């Protein structure tokens, strides 16, 4: 989706560097989002613990390779929708702004007070309260510091290695998905991923598919979200936009990544859901009419083949 050129971007919730400090693990990455899936594949191929993000205690320190995107550079560069259409980091900022505007309006309808997450845009690696974030892991949400961590170079990985197209909504879908994990955290649902962490019908898969559905809810309403001056953030959704989002959802399906990585599909080890299910739940969110209950993946017996009614 393209941003309206005159919309004003707000960088007040955008940071650089880690939210957790130090090298120790302050908590688990619950609902680790798309990044968690990539990490699991890396662990499968190269060994290691695929259940949590690596920390400096169990991997080589990044040392001088640890980089941050300068806060001041983002504030100077990311001012308008025109910047969001031109620069990846600014598109992240704009998507966060729009998602914030949407969920700040929606959550009170369900008796929940909205609280804003922090979004950390980094390059290379940085620290979070859940351990070390790196561009090998990809985007994730850390519930301990209520922050989204994202390296813009992940979008190149998504297209070059996993087959997504490079449309704007493919990238915005990733951000909206991670924002969806924050909404799950506010709703008290995120911990269910840990209680049942693996398998096609597991709590982990249901949490991820719900975040996809939340992303679809935002996408359908994004063109109505407004900045502080009443300007709408994004232009109306097009069929090409939807195709881009669905290509990204399919690219990070467990079956797609397993087939690419190991040449076979093992549903019993899934943590995020199949390509078809991820697409279906994103569409379900788009068709939900802003009814969050339509995204209740725990209300169906099989989230791979069923959609909440």
Specify the residue positions occupied by each region the protein language model found.
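Long amphipathic alpha-helical segments used for membrane anchoring, targeting, substrate engagement
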Residues: 1-73
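Short pre-active-site segment immediately N-terminal to the catalytic Zn-binding motif
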Residues: 156-173, 199-205
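Active-site recognition of the HExxH zinc-binding catalytic motif
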Residues: 41, 103, 150, 173-186, ...
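Catalytic Zn2+-binding segment of zinc metalloproteases
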Residues: 179-195, 217-218, 222-224
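Short helix/loop segments within enzyme catalytic domains
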Residues: 90, 94-96, 106-108, 210-255
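Catalytic zinc-binding patch centered on the HExxH motif and its immediate surroundings
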Residues: 124-151
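Post-HExxH zinc-binding segment in Zn-dependent metallohydrolases
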Residues: 2-16, 199-230
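Pan-zinc metallopeptidase signature
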Residues: 255-309
């Amino acid at each position: 989706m393209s941003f309206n050129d005159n919309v004003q971007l707000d960088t007040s919730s955008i940071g650089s560097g880690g939210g957790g400090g130090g090298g120790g693990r302050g908590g688990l990455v619950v609902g680790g989002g798309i990044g968690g899936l990539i990490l699991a594949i890396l662990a499968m191929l190269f060994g290691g613990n695929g259940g949590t993000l690596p920390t400096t205690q169990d991997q080589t320190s990044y040392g001088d390779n640890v980089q941050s995107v300068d806060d001041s550079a983002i504030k100077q560069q990311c001012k308008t929708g025109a910047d969001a259409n031109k620069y990846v980091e600014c598109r992240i900022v704009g998507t966060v702004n729009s998602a914030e505007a949407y969920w700040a309006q929606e959550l009170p309808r369900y008796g929940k007070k909205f609280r804003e997450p922090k979004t950390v845009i980094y390059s290379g690696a940085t620290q979070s309260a859940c351990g070390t974030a790196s561009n090998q892991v990809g985007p994730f949400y850390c519930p301990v510091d209520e922050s989204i961590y994202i390296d813009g170079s992940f979008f190149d990985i998504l297209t070059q290695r996993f087959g997504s197209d490079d449309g704007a909504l493919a990238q915005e879908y990733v951000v909206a998905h991670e924002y969806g994990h924050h909404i799950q955290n506010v709703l008290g649902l995120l911990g269910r991923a840990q209680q049942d962490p693996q398998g096609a019908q597991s709590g982990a898969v249901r949490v991820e598919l719900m975040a996809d559905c939340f992303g679809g809810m935002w996408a359908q309403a994004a063109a109505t979200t407004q900045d502080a001056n009443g300007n709408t953030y994004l232009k109306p959704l097009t069929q090409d936009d939807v195709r881009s989002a669905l290509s990204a959802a399919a690219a990070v399906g467990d079956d797609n990544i397993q087939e690419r990585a190991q040449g076979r599909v093992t549903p019993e080890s899934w943590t995020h859901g199949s390509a078809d299910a991820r697409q279906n739940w994103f569409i379900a969110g788009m068709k939900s009419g802003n009814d969050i209950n339509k995204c209740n993946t725990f209300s169906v017996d099989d989230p791979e083949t069923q959609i909440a009614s």
